[in-house]
Amino acid sequence: MCGIFGYCNFLIEKTRGEIIDTLIEGLQALEYKEYDSSGISIQGDELESLNIYKQTGKISSLKEEIDLYNLNKNLPFISHCGIAHTRRATHGGLRRANCHPHNSDPSNEFVVVHNGVITNFANLKALLMAKGYVFKSDTDTECIPKLYKHIYDTSIELGYNLDFHVLTNLVLKELEGSYGLLCTSSHFPDEVVAARKGSPLVIGVKGKTDMDVNFVEVEYLDQEEDYLKLNTQTKSSGNVLAAAPVKYNTCLRKSPPFVHNT
């Protein structure tokens, strides 16, 4: 049982302190009495860097953990994407290493928060460990950011420069089970990917003016042909080792309008 939350400011300056406060407030809104750990990921001092802060206990313990780092909370960000997570331990016991967010590597190239159950995580973990990836947790989630990195690195080696959403499609095709997830990456600063299968996920957009109307483009796999079909690159059938692209159809449609009365 988990709750995930993300916050993005785009071309609207926010300080690091404001961003952290928003992420914490989002977690507090999701917090349930049985939740026993939480964490956030935010941009570091450099553009292409991500920092992770997490702790067992209530969200108040996470706030205390963050304060230990004496961060410059006045540092401004014109654009920024942060993600957060709170959980009750299921896969993996109650220890800090099992808290989300989980990363792909010590440099935090890919960072993921996840709600759901990846039923084939044991097979994915065995495959990735055989490729040299080191797992720090007992969770099913940790295979996701490492899968991101493996497919990203393999694609670069093969000469394919994938964007974030195409890369995500490759990752999702390997996952079995249910998920609502958010992913950020140092390779794609100021971007966040949100995906769901089975688990709930809600996207909200705040308007700039009264009665502002916004839309979000949402990609669906294997939908009816009355939606716009896009040809995007993905790997051939088989396991994660295959990264040579072939074409498949996805469908793009706009969300219902977000109408704001600010």
From Swiss-Prot:
Enzyme Commission (EC) number: 2.6.1.16
Protein keywords: Aminotransferase, Glutamine amidotransferase, Transferase
GO molecular function: glutamine-fructose-6-phosphate transaminase (isomerizing) activity
A Pfam family: GATase_6
CDD domains (UniProt xref): GFAT (cd00714)
Any single biological process term in GO: UDP-N-acetylglucosamine biosynthetic process
Pathway membership, UniProt: Nucleotide-sugar biosynthesis; UDP-N-acetyl-alpha-D-glucosamine biosynthesis; alpha-D-glucosamine 6-phosphate from D-fructose 6-phosphate: step 1/1
Keyword check for RNA-binding: no
Reactions it catalyzes: D-fructose 6-phosphate + L-glutamine = D-glucosamine 6-phosphate + L-glutamate
Domain Glutamine amidotransferase type-2: 2-262
Gene3D superfamilies: Glutamine Phosphoribosylpyrophosphate, subunit 1, domain 1
Active site: C2
Disulfide bonds: none
Superkingdom: Eukaryota
Its job: Involved in amino sugar synthesis (formation of chitin, supplies the amino sugars of asparagine-linked oligosaccharides of glycoproteins).
Name assigned to this protein: Putative glutamine--fructose-6-phosphate aminotransferase [isomerizing]
